[in-house]
């Protein structure tokens, strides 16, 4: 639709005309708010982000062939036992049913008895995840994120060989992750092996878009800074919207909680990445290029 295209182009041109200093300030304010949210969550709960059963330990009760709303099951268990549980549906080649997650410290036997009352024809299957295993998973996840950042930073510095643009790319990726974690706290999404993987995916996507922008601006020839920025912005906007569309479809049509969580975290991160790449990084690069060319 030509009208929609024109509106989008006009909105993108507003970014091109924005003061570079303001482009830096606004994303930093959002980053600061995200840090405050994470710290507040730590003060209230003792954890920067709520951890799933895989990390904190607990029990997983599986009921094959059950086709009841997870919310109804969780509500009924709460009424019968006073225990808060997480319930999700699953389906696959091996069959379908529900999984009930019980935190370590809660009486799993009470939950099992409540489930037997609700579904007398189904035998609950229980798997216990010990705190030691959860600690190992947590440590491995943290190491994976740290190593990914170190590897990404090395590659970026080797590619550009210029401190300011390289550090901005690294900071943008870090900010994407921090904002995604803050939104996980707001929407109650737990940190698990799946969401750790989603956070790692964000690093790769962030680097792609930032390298596109930085390369276009630093290595432009016949274009002005504004023209190069607008050209890369249109490309980046197309990349982001198509990816967000795919993730939104995944979130809407998925029936598995783990898929919903992955899609949600990626959506949070991609929205943050659009801001950090095309506003924050662009503002830093425009100031850097203006200063560098002013000295030449």
From Swiss-Prot:
<dbReference type="Pfam" id="PF02355">
    <property type="entry name" value="SecD_SecF_C"/>
</dbReference>
<feature type="transmembrane region" description="Helical">
    <location>
        <begin position="144"/>
        <end position="164"/>
    </location>
</feature>
<dbReference type="InterPro" id="IPR022813">
    <property type="entry name" value="SecD/SecF_arch_bac"/>
</dbReference>
<keyword id="KW-0813">Transport</keyword>
<keyword id="KW-1133">Transmembrane helix</keyword>
<keyword id="KW-0812">Transmembrane</keyword>
<dbReference type="GO" id="GO:0006605">
    <property type="term" value="P:protein targeting"/>
</dbReference>
<keyword id="KW-0472">Membrane</keyword>
<dbReference type="InterPro" id="IPR048634">
    <property type="entry name" value="SecD_SecF_C"/>
</dbReference>
<protein>
    <recommendedName>
        <fullName>Protein-export membrane protein SecF</fullName>
    </recommendedName>
</protein>
<keyword id="KW-1003">Cell membrane</keyword>
<feature type="transmembrane region" description="Helical">
    <location>
        <begin position="236"/>
        <end position="256"/>
    </location>
</feature>
<keyword id="KW-0653">Protein transport</keyword>
<dbReference type="InterPro" id="IPR024921">
    <property type="entry name" value="SecF_arc"/>
</dbReference>
<feature type="transmembrane region" description="Helical">
    <location>
        <begin position="265"/>
        <end position="285"/>
    </location>
</feature>
<feature type="transmembrane region" description="Helical">
    <location>
        <begin position="169"/>
        <end position="189"/>
    </location>
</feature>
<comment type="similarity">
    <text>Belongs to the SecD/SecF family. SecF subfamily.</text>
</comment>
<comment type="subunit">
    <text>Part of the protein translocation apparatus. Forms a complex with SecD.</text>
</comment>
<feature type="transmembrane region" description="Helical">
    <location>
        <begin position="194"/>
        <end position="214"/>
    </location>
</feature>
<comment type="function">
    <text>Involved in protein export.</text>
</comment>
<dbReference type="GO" id="GO:0005886">
    <property type="term" value="C:plasma membrane"/>
</dbReference>
<dbReference type="GO" id="GO:0065002">
    <property type="term" value="P:intracellular protein transmembrane transport"/>
</dbReference>
<feature type="transmembrane region" description="Helical">
    <location>
        <begin position="23"/>
        <end position="43"/>
    </location>
</feature>
<keyword id="KW-0811">Translocation</keyword>
């Amino acid at each position: 639709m030509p009208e929609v295209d024109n509106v989008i182009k006009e909105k993108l041109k507003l970014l091109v005309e924005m003061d570079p200093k303001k482009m830096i300030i606004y994303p930093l304010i959002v980053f600061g708010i995200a840090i405050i949210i994470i710290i507040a969550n730590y003060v209230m709960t003792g954890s920067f982000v709520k951890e799933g059963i895989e990390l904190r330990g607990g029990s997983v009760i599986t009921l094959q062939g059950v086709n009841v709303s997870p919310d109804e099951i969780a509500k009924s268990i709460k009424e019968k036992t006073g225990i808060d549980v997480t319930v999700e549906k699953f389906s696959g080649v091996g069959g379908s049913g529900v999984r009930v997650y019980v935190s370590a410290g809660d009486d799993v036997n009470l939950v099992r008895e409540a489930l037997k009352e609700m579904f007398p024809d189904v035998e609950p299957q229980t798997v216990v995840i010990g705190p030691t295993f959860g600690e190992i998973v947590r440590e491995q996840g943290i190491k994976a994120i740290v190593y990914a950042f170190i590897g990404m930073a090395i590659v970026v510095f080797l590619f550009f060989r210029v401190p300011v643009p390289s550090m901005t790319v690294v900071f943008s990726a870090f900010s994407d992750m921090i904002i995604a974690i803050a939104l996980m706290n707001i929407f109650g999404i737990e940190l698990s092996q799946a969401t750790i993987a989603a956070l790692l995916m964000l690093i790769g996507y962030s680097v792609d878009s930032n390298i596109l922008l930085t390369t276009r601006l630093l290595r432009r020839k016949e274009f002005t800074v504004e023209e190069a920025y607008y050209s890369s912005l249109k490309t980046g906007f197309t990349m982001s919207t198509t990816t967000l569309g795919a993730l939104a479809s995944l979130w809407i049509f998925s029936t598995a909680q783990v898929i919903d969580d992955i899609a949600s975290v990626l959506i949070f991160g991609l929205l943050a990445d659009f801001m950090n790449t095309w506003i924050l990084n662009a503002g830093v690069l425009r100031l850097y290029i203006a200063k560098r060319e002013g000295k030449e």
